[in-house]
């Protein structure tokens, strides 16, 4: 039976290395998905750590956010071509040990239909990959993108959804202004 929950890491929105600084221990086993809160829907988002949220694969709002992220990749290319200042990242599914997480990669280059970069987060589902590993990701596999310059962010549709799902005061702590 396939696990109906996926992990969304939104560390790149709050700063690279922050997740690693929280003391996340690397393990060869996938992180356990916590049970839903009493009385909550079985598809409700579930906090796994301070900066990792588990979403059901059936969560329509998060799926819509991923679809928007992918469908707006032409805007990401426009911002790159215009030389918009900031850190450029893309989110993609990373599978290891039979579990998939959705993780950010900081771009260092472009290939023919691919993005090249460094993992911006510490993967939670195993030890095969680590933050800073060089990766090449097909554009077809990209689920979201961001250009982050200080507190201003273009894109980041899955992060927007994660913020919408948390208490407003918690989201406000991150000081992010989304632009389009």
Task: Please describe what each predicted stretch is.
Residues 2-104, 108-180:
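Mixed-charge, low-complexity intrinsically disordered regions
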């Amino acid at each position: 039976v396939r696990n109906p929950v996926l992990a969304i890491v939104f560390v790149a929105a709050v700063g690279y290395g922050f997740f690693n600084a929280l003391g996340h221990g690397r393990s060869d086993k996938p992180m356990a998905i916590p049970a839903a809160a009493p009385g909550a829907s079985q598809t409700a988002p579930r906090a796994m750590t301070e900066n990792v949220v588990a979403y059901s694969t059936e969560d329509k709002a998060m799926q819509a956010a991923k679809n928007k992220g992918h469908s707006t990749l032409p805007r990401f290319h426009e911002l790159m071509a215009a030389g918009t200042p900031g850190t450029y990242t893309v989110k993609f599914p990373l599978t290891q040990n039979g579990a998939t997480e959705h993780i950010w990669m900081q771009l260092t280059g472009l290939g023919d239909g691919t993005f090249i970069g460094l993992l911006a987060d510490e993967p939670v589902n195993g030890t095969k990959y680590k933050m800073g590993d060089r990766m090449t990701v097909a554009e077809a596999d990209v689920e979201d993108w961001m250009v982050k310059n200080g507190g201003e962010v273009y894109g980041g549709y899955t992060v927007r959804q994660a913020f919408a799902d948390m208490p407003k005061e918690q989201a406000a702590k991150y000081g992010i202004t989304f632009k389009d």
